[in-house]
Amino acid sequence: MSKVLIVDDHPAIRLAVRLLFERDGFTIVGEADNGAEALQVARKKSPDLAILDIGIPKIDGLEVIARLKSLKLDTKVLVLTRQNPAQFAPRCLQAGAMGFVSKRENLSELLLAAKAVLAGYIHFPTGALRSINQQSRDNEARMLESLSDREMTVLQYLANGNTNKAIAQQLFLSEKTVSTYKSRIMLKLNAHSLAGLIDFARRHELI
């Protein structure tokens, strides 16, 4: 069965989570009451799942999530916290967590979330996901606004499948100039490939 690490600075919470998961057949491989200890246990035990409060001492939970991700462990993170989901769920997702459950929820919700996360799904409050999606759309809108008129034109040509040579002929530019525009556009839109540019253009109905 899956191996679980529990990280919370409240012993009663750790005990409740341990009992819940052990009853369901999970193996608890460690507990920690602070971020530094959590990272040590994670390195040593390589748990499948870390159930983590973000309001913990020494190293806060958001930093723990980021460090676990940088360590390239196969540990999925499920946040269990009293913090406001609207404010902290997006931050947890951006840091690398795969789930977020409020301590105000019934503990059975935590078990459902854990199973979803271990199966490869994300589990976040619906309102928080809407907030995350809106933030992403706002960021992309600002990226588009940073493009010059000429860059926007080149983007549309690229997104429609035109080669640098074809674009150069259409716009009476050199291929080198088109290539420079393409590089600038990819940098401004944080796209790492032509496919990424096309996806971006499609999301914003430019093609």
Curated annotation (Swiss-Prot):
Residues 140-205 form the HTH luxR-type domain. The modification 4-aspartylphosphate is found at D9, D53. InterPro entries: CheY-like_superfamily, Sig_transdc_resp-reg_C-effctor, Sig_transdc_resp-reg_receiver, Tscrpt_reg_LuxR_C, WalR-like. One of its GO terms (molecular function) is DNA binding. GO terms for biological process: phosphorelay signal transduction system; regulation of DNA-templated transcription. Residues 155-174 bind DNA. Signal peptide: none annotated. Gene3D superfamilies: 3.40.50.2300. Pfam families: GerE, Response_reg. Residues 3-118 form the Response regulatory domain. Keywords: DNA-binding, Phosphoprotein, Transcription, Transcription regulation, Two-component regulatory system. Probable transcriptional regulator. This is Putative transcriptional regulator. It comes from Pseudomonas aeruginosa (strain ATCC 15692 / DSM 22644 / CIP 104116 / JCM 14847 / LMG 12228 / 1C / PRS 101 / PAO1).
